[in-house]
Each structure stands twice: as C-alpha cells, then as structure tokens.
C-alpha cells in the first residue's frame, strides 16, 4: 500500500491559512504533497504563483473544484512524509518546494519547506518568500 501523507499537527491560528482554488484539483494530485502559492487574484495555485510559494497542500478527496476553499499549511508536521514523486522522506534531510509545485531534496531554486525526523515526519516550517 502506498504511503498517504497527512497533516499530523497544525495550529490553525499560526500554521495555516485558507484560500480559494484557482483550478480544479486533479485526481492524479490526490494524496500527494504539493507546494502552493497565490496567483494575482489571491487564489491558490500549485507552484509559486504571483506570490512565490507560501505553503504545503495535501488533498485527500476527489471533486474539489475551482473556488473551493482549502487550507495551505505553513507550519506543523506531516506524517508520513513523501515527496511529490512518492519517495519516502530521508531522516535528517531538508526539503524544498519549487515553482512547479513539486517538493524534493533539491535546494537549487527552491523554498525551504522543512526537514525530516527519524520516524519519517516532516517538520514543516515554510520559508517566507523574499
């Protein structure tokens, strides 16, 4: 069975914010960890958008449409952590979000997202765009 990452801990007052979706969530994107930003209309988009990447999104249900409100997480914990490509997080490794929405261990042109603990948990602390 494939790992299904979830937000394990989050403080809604300081660890996330809400925004409407700019586009429908694709079925292929369900149960994957994505890096999100906002477009020039303030709607949530996969990738950097107009704002630069702001947080992490994991959707678990099909049928979410443009305009639906979602949570974008900026701080908290994800468990079990897997990259957007489905690779399990490596303990002690830093992970980065990219302009295309993917999250991996490549720092080049990426925003710091967090690091992984010994039990495979991502400690989420998204870097604020400059």
What are these regions (language model features)?
Residues 1-130:
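Surface-exposed, low-hydrophobicity beta-strand/loop segments enriched in small/polar/acidic residues
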